[in-house]
């Protein structure tokens, strides 16, 4: 027994030393070290870091320099740290949509662009000319085997335009997670499914309750320039020629032409027994013309190699977007959208965490991969490109911590993560936060679908267990009135020229959270196994596919 005790004592000393080393390195993440990068990236010199602009180039140059100073190596094969990717800017310049009587091939009614509908080419074509297309109402347009749900039962939609109800079913907490908006409820899923099913077009019915925002958001957003990852020459762009939205009023008029009651059909979609409905003798003719411009964007990818020969080809993926909105129409003489909170702050936290992992390099088994992406603000396109063109095998990525914003308004008692309860990675956050007496909470507004609105979503789509840390809500030392003021200021500054460092900023909360997630990352780096989605999660199948299971 004495010999066992003597053998055990050095092990305890080793563990204590390692723990002390972790705390010491984590303590080097300070308010000053976080502000250092924010003050540079959010300065006017970087011109708002717009995608494909001179400001983006300046940001890339700065990031590569910082990564080299940290001691990271390039995460792309050519050693440049830069993953370029081509984008297309698309703007619809001419459009018409009319209801037709199929039996006579005649138009009987015309919708008004912007007021009744918005539409655009779905396959990066310059012109679309659809005549007398048949219409099929497909409810939510969802196929979800894990929910025993198929809105395309016994119907062939090839060559037809499908009409889709927005969102996903909310009638039962045990079906599609109740009021929590899953990816099935996002408009991107609807359009992807239309392409997969071979539909000629896809139109989503807008209502404010199902969208969570008014028609003005749809009409203003989709009538402006939109962006896409450019399809490779000769690539299959799919058979879907157009996508769009239709107002509730215009949709009601369309269904009445077919002798159908829209409200009844919207209600009927809330059942696994729903069957698609053909709009008899009623079609649509659609003409669109769009203009395009080419944009060259850049991701920055870096690596810190792990020390374990068996595990160093597996990775903790840290992600953050460095782009913002660039230069826009002046407001009170200011035209630069500096993007301090969104997302110079998140990039700074990533760089600070990476610096800590470099110092711990002999003690980390797996490697760290940092993807600092562009084009998040125009549709999560930088992370989409990386996920579809990964610089390491997807099955080798142990988990993803996405840093989009941070807590710039002071310390909180609690921690919020988007992705709470969905993966073993989320469980690690709970374990580490519990050690320091901080409760972990889920997203307070699951109906907004925040899980699908930042770069970690593209990582999840290809199977990588991912979390998105958010500021806590229980602030320390702030009154209710103070928090109302801060909330109001933060909301007003979001996506505006006023997103700059201001008098309300207090980075003590950012430090506290960054140190916590630094330790969560260490758990991923040194765990026996890579992270996993919990059984039944919507991304579990993608993970198993990436692991060839």
Each model region followed by its residue ranges:
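Bacterial Sec-dependent N-terminal signal peptides
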Residues: 1-25
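N-terminal hydrophobic or amphipathic helices/low-complexity stretches enriched
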Residues: 17-77, 97, 250-251, 257, ...
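Soluble metallo-hydrolase cores and metallopeptidase-like ectodomains found primarily
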Residues: 21-22, 101-105, 118-154, 235-339, ...
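Extracellular/luminal Protease-associated
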Residues: 23, 113-234, 305, 338, ...
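Noncatalytic luminal/extracellular "stalk/propeptide" segments of secretory-pathway proteins
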Residues: 47-172, 280, 424
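Metal-dependent peptidase/peptidase-like ectodomains
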Residues: 112-115, 127-128, 229-261, 373-479, ...
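Active-site-adjacent substrate-binding region
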Residues: 175, 195, 206, 264-267, ...
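Acidic/histidine-rich catalytic neighborhood of metal-dependent amide-processing enzymes
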Residues: 183, 189, 193, 209-210, ...
């Amino acid at each position: 027994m004495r010999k066992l005790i003597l053998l055990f004592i050095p092990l305890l000393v080793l563990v204590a030393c390692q723990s002390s080393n972790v705390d010491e390195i984590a303590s080097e993440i300070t308010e000053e070290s976080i502000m250092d990068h924010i003050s540079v990236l959010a300065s006017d010199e970087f011109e708002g870091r717009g995608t494909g602009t001179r400001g983006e180039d300046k940001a890339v140059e700065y990031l590569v320099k910082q990564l080299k100073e940290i001691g990271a190596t390039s995460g792309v094969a050519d050693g440049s740290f830069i993953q370029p990717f081509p984008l297309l800017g698309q703007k619809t310049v001419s459009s018409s949509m009319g209801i037709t009587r199929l039996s006579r091939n005649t138009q009987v009614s015309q919708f008004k662009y912007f007021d009744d509908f918005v539409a655009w080419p779905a396959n990066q074509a310059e012109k679309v000319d659809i005549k007398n297309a048949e219409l099929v109402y497909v409810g939510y347009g969802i196929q979800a085997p894990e929910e025993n749900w198929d809105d395309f039962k016994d119907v062939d939609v090839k060559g037809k335009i499908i009409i889709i109800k927005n969102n996903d079913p909310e009638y039962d907490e045990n079906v599609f997670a109740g009021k929590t908006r899953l990816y099935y409820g996002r408009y991107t899923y609807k359009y992807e499914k239309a392409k997969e099913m071979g539909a000629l077009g896809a139109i989503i019915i807008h209502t404010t309750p199902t969208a969570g925002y008014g028609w003005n958001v749809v009409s203003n957003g989709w009538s402006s320039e939109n962006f896409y990852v450019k399809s490779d020459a000769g690539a299959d762009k799919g058979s879907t020629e157009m996508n769009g939205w239709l107002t509730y009023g215009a949709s009601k008029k369309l269904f009445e032409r077919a002798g159908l009651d829209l409200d009844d059909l919207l209600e009927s979609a809330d059942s696994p027994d729903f069957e698609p409905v053909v709009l008899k003798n009623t079609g649509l003719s659609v003409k669109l013309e769009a203009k395009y411009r080419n944009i060259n964007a850049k991701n920055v990818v870096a690596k810190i190699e792990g020390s374990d020969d068996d595990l160093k080809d597996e990775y903790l993926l840290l992600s953050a977007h460095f782009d913002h909105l660039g230069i826009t129409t002046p407001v009170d003489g200011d035209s630069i959208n500096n993007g301090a909170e969104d997302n110079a702050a998140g990039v700074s936290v990533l760089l600070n965490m990476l610096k800590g992992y470099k110092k711990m390099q002999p003690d980390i088994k797996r490697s760290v991969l940092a993807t600092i992406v562009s084009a998040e603000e125009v549709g999560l396109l930088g992370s989409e490109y990386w996920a579809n063109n990964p610089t390491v095998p997807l099955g080798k990525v142990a988990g993803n911590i996405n840093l989009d914003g941070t807590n710039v308004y002071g310390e909180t008692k609690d921690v919020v993560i988007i992705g709470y309860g969905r993966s073993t990675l989320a469980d690690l956050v709970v374990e580490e936060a519990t050690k320091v007496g901080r409760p972990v909470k889920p997203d307070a507004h699951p109906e907004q679908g925040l899980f699908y609105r930042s770069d970690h979503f593209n990582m999840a789509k290809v199977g990588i267990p991912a979390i998105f840390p958010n500021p806590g809500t229980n602030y320390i030392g702030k009154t209710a009135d103070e928090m109302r003021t801060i909330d109001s200021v933060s909301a007003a500054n979001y996506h505006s020229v006023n997103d700059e460092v201001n008098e309300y900023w207090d980075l003590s909360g950012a430090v506290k959270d960054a140190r916590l997630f630094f330790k969560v990352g260490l758990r991923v780096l040194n765990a026996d196994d890579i992270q996993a989605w919990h059984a039944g999660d919507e991304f579990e199948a993608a993970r198993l596919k990436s692991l060839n299971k």
